């Protein structure tokens, strides 16, 4: 298989029909990913392989007075703060994060964020992939 053929299997694959990008090998430009609104002032960009998912989340509705409602999921999560500042709540712990900081969330642990600046960009990674994100 050539690099051109392998670059974006999603363009012809079933997951592409659900507006998501599955990457087998190669590169993916943000301009090639369909932005997905996930609430007022929030946009998600998804890419995934068979077992790993990455979500770039742009929050443009900060700062917020209160944290978002906590949630949990059976996936492992590692997140990287690209820009902005936020509080992250994981279980009973609260930490202020800035660009370059990271946080990890074990499966099934309640967690959430509170935006401290107008714009925050996170890169979230999940294993296994979050199938619920693909069916929306």
Model-derived features with residue positions:
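Short acidic-glycine-tyrosine-enriched beta hairpin
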Residues: 92-107
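N-terminal amphipathic/basic-hydrophobic helices that include classical n-h-c signal peptides
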Residues: 1-21
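Short strand-coil-strand connectors
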Residues: 50, 89-93, 116
């Amino acid at each position: 298989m050539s690099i051109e053929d392998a670059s974006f299997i999603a363009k012809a694959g079933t997951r592409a029909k659900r507006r998501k990008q599955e990457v087998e090998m190669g590169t993916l430009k943000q301009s090639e990913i369909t932005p997905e609104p996930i609430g007022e002032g929030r946009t998600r960009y998804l890419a995934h392989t068979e077992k790993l998912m990455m979500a770039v989340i742009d929050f443009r509705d900060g700062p917020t007075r209160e944290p978002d409602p906590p949630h949990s999921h059976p996936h492992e999560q590692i997140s990287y703060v690209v820009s902005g500042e936020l509080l992250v709540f994981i279980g009973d712990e609260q930490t202020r994060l800035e660009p370059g900081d990271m946080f990890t969330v074990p499966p099934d642990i309640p967690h959430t964020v509170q935006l401290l600046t107008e714009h925050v960009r996170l890169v979230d990674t999940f294993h296994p992939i979050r199938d619920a994100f693909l069916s929306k």
